[in-house]
């Protein structure tokens, strides 16, 4: 069952769900908690690789990713990151989230932003039980105009579901968890797939 606003507040008070910094009461609505945009971004550099063979040898995949991904870009509070039409960028939430082994989270974009062409997550919107860290956002501008994204703006909402019991393989205990304790806009680690 999806948690209600009252249940979310109870989970935050009890420390069952941790969100740092803790959201204000205004950020909690019927079944969700607003999350804000952090200061870190990464983009794809133009024309630095003809393609990436996603099923190729791990070393080749990683070398191609290293060529196409920018270094971390830090945007100061009050300044804007501009996402142009047809561009993909990675960013990170301001908040760090920790979930127990019996709760799964879901990230949803904001309808007001989607109506301008902004996708907040291209596909990956599940936050696994046992997750600990910031959430990487996969921005895509499918609109016609550049979009100015500013750190601290409300960028999406998290909602939570309590499972019938704790999972036996929570994310923070998995040896092969590629994004464990993520605190910045981490690029794809697909080369670590086995």
Swiss-Prot record:
Root EC class: hydrolase
Catalysed reaction equations from the record: dCTP + H2O + H(+) = dUTP + NH4(+)
Catalytic residues (UniProt): 138 (proton donor/acceptor)
Swiss-Prot/TrEMBL keywords: Hydrolase, Nucleotide metabolism, Nucleotide-binding
Gene3D superfamilies assigned to the protein according to its UniProt record, in alphabetical order: 2.70.40.10
GO biological process, one term: dUMP biosynthetic process
Species in which this protein is naturally found: Shewanella amazonensis (strain ATCC BAA-1098 / SB2B)
Job description of the protein: Catalyzes the deamination of dCTP to dUTP.
SUBUNIT field: Homotrimer.
Matching PANTHER family: DCTP DEAMINASE
EC id: 3.5.4.13
Family: Belongs to the dCTP deaminase family.
One Pfam entry name: DCD
Binding site for dCTP: 110-115, 128, 136-138, 171, 178, 182
Region (Disordered): 171-194
Name assigned to this protein: dCTP deaminase
Biochemical pathway: Pyrimidine metabolism; dUMP biosynthesis; dUMP from dCTP (dUTP route): step 1/2
MF terms (GO), sorted A to Z: dCTP deaminase activity; nucleotide binding
């Amino acid at each position: 069952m999806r948690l209600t606003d009252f249940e979310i507040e109870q989970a935050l008070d009890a420390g069952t769900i941790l969100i740092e910094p803790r959201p204000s009461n205004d950020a909690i609505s019927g079944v969700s908690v607003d999350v804000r945009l952090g200061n870190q971004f990464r983009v794809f550099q133009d024309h630095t690789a003809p393609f990436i063979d996603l099923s190729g040898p791990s070393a080749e995949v990683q070398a191609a990713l290293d060529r196409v991904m920018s270094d971390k870009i830090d945007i100061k509070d009050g300044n804007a990151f501009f996402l142009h039409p047809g561009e993909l960028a990675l960013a990170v939430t301001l908040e760090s989230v920790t979930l127990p082994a019996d709760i799964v989270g879901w990230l949803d974009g904001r309808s007001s932003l989607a109506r301008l062409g902004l996708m907040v997550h291209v596909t990956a919107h599940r936050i696994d039980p046992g997750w600990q860290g910031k959430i990487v956002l996969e921005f895509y501008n499918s609109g016609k105009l550049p979009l100015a994204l500013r750190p601290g703006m409300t960028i999406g909402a998290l909602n939570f579901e309590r499972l019938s019991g704790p999972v036996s393989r929570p994310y923070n205990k998995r040896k092969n968890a590629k994004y464990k304790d993520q605190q910045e806009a981490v690029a794809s680690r697909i080369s670590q797939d086995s």
